[in-house]
Structures are given as C-alpha cells and as structure tokens.
Amino acid sequence: MKKLSGIGVSDGMALAKAFLVKTPEFAVNKYLKHQLTKAQAKRLLDSAFKKAVKDLEEIKEITVNNINTEAGMIFDAHIQMLNDPTITEQLEQQLAQNVHPVIAVDTVFSQTATMFSQMQDKYFQERAADILDLRQRLLAYLTGQKPHDLVKIKSDVIIVAHDLTPSQTATLNKKYVKGFLTEIGGRTSHAAIMARSLEIPAVVGIKGITTKVKDGQIVGVDGRKGIAGLDLNSKDTTEWKKQKALEEKYQQELKQYTNKETVTLDGHAVVVAANIGNVKDMELACQYNTNGVGLFRTEFLYMNSQEWPDEETQYQAYKAVLEQAHGDLVIIRTLDIGGDKKLNYYEFPHEDNPFLGYRALRLTLDKQDIFKTQLRALLRAADHGQLGIMFPMVATLDELLQAKQLLNQVHQELGGNKQFKLGIMIEIPAAVLAANTLSHHVDFFSIGTNDLIQYSFAADRMNKNVSYLYQPLNPALLKLIYLTIEGGKVNDIWTGMCGEMAGEPLAIPLLLGLGLKEFSMSASSMFKARMIIAKLNYTECQTLAQKALTLANAKEVEKLVEKFFKKKDIFI
C-alpha cells in the first residue's frame, strides 16, 4: 500500500472507490474580445447573481435539513459576500469601462481571493475558498454552464478533487460519500467544517492526489492521521477495515467529552474556549459547547465594510456574541489590521517589512478616533455578558499604558461603571521578557503562538523555504511560554493561549504542565482537547514540561510526549 500524507480535517476512516472531480474551466480569456452594451452586461450580471443567490438559498435549506442550522449559516455568509458593497462597487467600475461580465467577475473575485489567501492568519487564508466558490458559481451561469454540484452520486465513493467548494461539500449525501481527499485546503476552511458536521472523514493538502488516483480505483481515507491509502492489496484492505472499527470506537469515546468543564484526573481545572471571527462562528462554537471565547478577531467587521464600521454596527456584533456566551468570558481583540490584512477604503503607507511595521495597536494608537469608536462599542456591549478586552501586538509598557489611558478616557465618558477584564496578546519576544512588568497593568495574558514563533525564529511560516523553522515544540519556544506564564504569576494573573498550538495534541500536556489556564482553539478541536486533558494528571504534566525544557530540539520533545502518551494509553 502506498500512503500519501496531508492534513486530517475530519476524523474517521473509510474505504471505497474513488470519484474523481474535475475542476471546471471557463476559458475566460475568450471573452476579452466579446462586446456587450452596458445595459446587456448589467442584465447578464444581474441574472447570474440572482441565480447564484437562489442556488445558495436552496443549498442552505438542504444543509439545514441534512446537517444543522449552524452549517446552513455558512451560506448566509456567502449571500452576504455577493451583496458586499466593496465587491459590487468593483464590478460596477469594471462594467463602466466596458469590461465583459465574465472578465469582471473573474478579476474581482480572483483578486479578493488572492488578498485573503496571502494573509498570515489561517482563518483568513481559508476564506479565499469561499470567494472562489462564488466565482465558480457566477462564471458557470455567465458562460451558460451548470454549477458542478455532487448531489447525483448514488453509490459508495470517496471524492478525490483539487479542492471542494463549501457548496459542493454541503450537498454531499453521506449515505454514499464515505470521505474525501483534496490537494488544497485547511482545518478551518468551510469545506472542512462541513465534513466534520457531516461526520465524513476527510484529508486535504495532499499534493498531486488527482494525478495519482484513477476514477473507480479503491482508496482509503484516515482523517485523524491525515493519510490517504492507495494501491491496497487484500491484506491492506483487511487491516484498513480493522483499523476503521477501532477508529469508530474512538470517535464514540470523543463524544463523551461535551461538557464545558475540563478537569484533569487530579482535579486541576482549565478552560477550553473557542477562537471566532464573527457572530456565525460563535453559533458553531456553541454547538461544541464552548466555555466562552478566547479570541474574537474583529478584523472581519472592518474588512467586510466599505468604510470604517460605526459604533452601532460594532456594538450589535459584540453584543450578539456576549449574549450567546451566557455569562462565560468573551475575549474580544481590538483591531489587528495591517501587515497582510488590508482595507479597501484605507491606503496603508508603503513599508519594506509591513509585518514589523504599522499594524495592530501601533495603527490604532495613531488613529485614535477609530480606536475610541471600537472601545465605546466594546464597553457598551459589556452590559450583555462577561467581556474581556485584549490589545494585540504589545511590544512595550509605554504602548500598553497609552492604550489603557484611551480606554479609561472612553470608560469615563460612558459613566465609568462598566465591568470588564483587560488583557494583552503576548506575541513579541520583548513582551515575554517584560511579562513581570506588564502583568502589573492587566488582568490576563493570551499567548499568540503563530506570531511569537515567527518573530522568535525570524521565519515567515508562509515562506516554504524556511517553513521548517515553524516549530511549536522547540524547547526555546516552550521557555518563552514558561517565562510568560511565570511573569503573569508574579501579579497573580492567568495566562491563556489563542494560537494554533493550543489545540495541538502533542503540545497540550506540555502547556498544561507549564501552567497554562486557558486553551482557545477552533471549535472542532475542543472535544479532542477535553478528552486529552481529562486523561492527564496535572502533577505528571508539570514534571513532563520541566523535562521538555531541558531537551535540545523539537524532535526530542515530540518523542518525549509520544512516549508519555503511549504509557498512559492516550491515542491522538
């Protein structure tokens, strides 16, 4: 048997014939010479939009009936994207220049998708797939084709594709579709979320899978290990089925860990919370019984707007999430824009290295009117739940004190009677080294490992040439985390983590042993994290973590934790 590795995004195992999905081609360039009147172009584009909206409403209904309401809301977001003022304005500008609607849609949606795909944050990267899904649907109608949905499959198959759009995934019939394998994608893509909701095993990011599999060939999917099995003989098939039975038993065990409360075997309690980017994400997180929100990224409120969002718009969004949390802490990060996250209505200054430049708190401290508007909306929303306000990208005490001064000023303007917690992101090495001092001025720390790793190892994780340096288990990084937690303890404040590392199974016992109090992650990772923590002894994890700090490299740490898990019969 040949095994191909990718990213497991939906647990489970399956074995069936491959159903190869070809990516539609629209020959966009041939429309460069097509001439339409402006009225004809407008009618053609409007018709395509109406058909697309009708499709999405029908797909939403199918999704709600076959999966759940939360999954269906993904298509509300798609309809909102079609109505996004920024996109419609760009399309109108193209038509005004006598550009054919096919070229206009291809240009605007491709550019928007590229903008998202180039962002550092995986959550934002994977929204590019939603934009391309809409592009594909609109181009199909504009060129007289039918969107390629997969509702007609009537035999047991495993889908093999370059990528699956969210709308394709939503219409899969789990009676027949036993799993899927794709060349691109990630854990927080909407297609991955759909797969988990349908409980269909899936592996994405398998390079060249569509060229290595023939239509009708027997293939295997192992969604937990992130493996595709090809060229299976009878012995391989028997073993795969045996492992599948064990996997099904494991999945049933996972479903026992739905309670919010997460406690180790020796009674040490921690919080497992969700990372979200909008109100709809919170609805999905509630399905996983989240214990509050460890990170609410507010960037989408700004990126989905044609101008700086006003106070009322922001207030309504923050209020909605706080109310859904039913008294659990909701940590809302103030605007973290800049670097790779741009706004259509604001021109950032040119910088040779924007990731080390004018972004996040540095920008909002400079644009105080914008900052105060957000702070007012946040403080007003505090009446509707337990609010945590978090400043991103804090490098120095001076920055923190300046931000606090503005917050206190706005608070006094609103009467000074709002209840909230204040925290900062620890994602710059200088902040780690100043943790003892910074902890005097806040209620909590939240470690942003995605940026902390990049800045500590001087390596852009999106750069394939240096991606090997993205090492969450490196002892040097573990020491930075430990310094942060200990720095917080000096002034009796707790430390959480909202980077991807918080949901990484091999990291969990180490983070627990180092003293992390809150683990914030994508909603789909929470059951597994709770299960792992519930099988651990806090005292043993402390010993394990201290041992890890003495090791030489990430590989040694990985082996240490794997041995620890094996001894305790913990399977991940």
Curated annotation (Swiss-Prot):
It catalyses: L-histidyl-[protein] + phosphoenolpyruvate = N(pros)-phospho-L-histidyl-[protein] + pyruvate. PANTHER family: PHOSPHOENOLPYRUVATE-PROTEIN PHOSPHOTRANSFERASE (PTHR46244:SF3). One of its GO terms (cellular component) is cytoplasm. Its cofactor is Mg(2+). Homodimer. One of its GO terms (biological process) is phosphoenolpyruvate-dependent sugar phosphotransferase system. This is Phosphoenolpyruvate-protein phosphotransferase. It comes from Mycoplasma pneumoniae (strain ATCC 29342 / M129 / Subtype 1) (Mycoplasmoides pneumoniae). The gene is ptsI.
